Amino acid sequence: EIKDNSKLFLQKIAQILVKYKYNVIEIEGHTDNIPISNSKYEDNRSLSSERARSVYEYVVSQEHFIDSNIKIAGYGDSRPVASNETEEGRAKNRRVAIKIYNKQNSNN
């Protein structure tokens, strides 16, 4: 679920992304390395997938996109951007990243 304080930010992101609606857009969910401890998610990978899916659904609801050009992926704790040894680092790793690729070469 998208937090209220993130909705305005995501609305602005959606306005930017619509300019790239013919490119390939990937929405990636990530987590820290602390195992999830609730019954809603089986593991961190499923939590990260849900994060990406939630952002995808919200962004698509704000603007008209070609759904086939948007990919979602959940990477769990496999791609940290900071150390998981500190709370600050773990907070940075709990994120959603949005990447825009050239449609002709989606490896860029």
What name fits each language-model region?
Residues E1-Y20, H30-N108:
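Periplasmic OmpA-like peptidoglycan-binding domain that tethers envelope proteins to the cell wall
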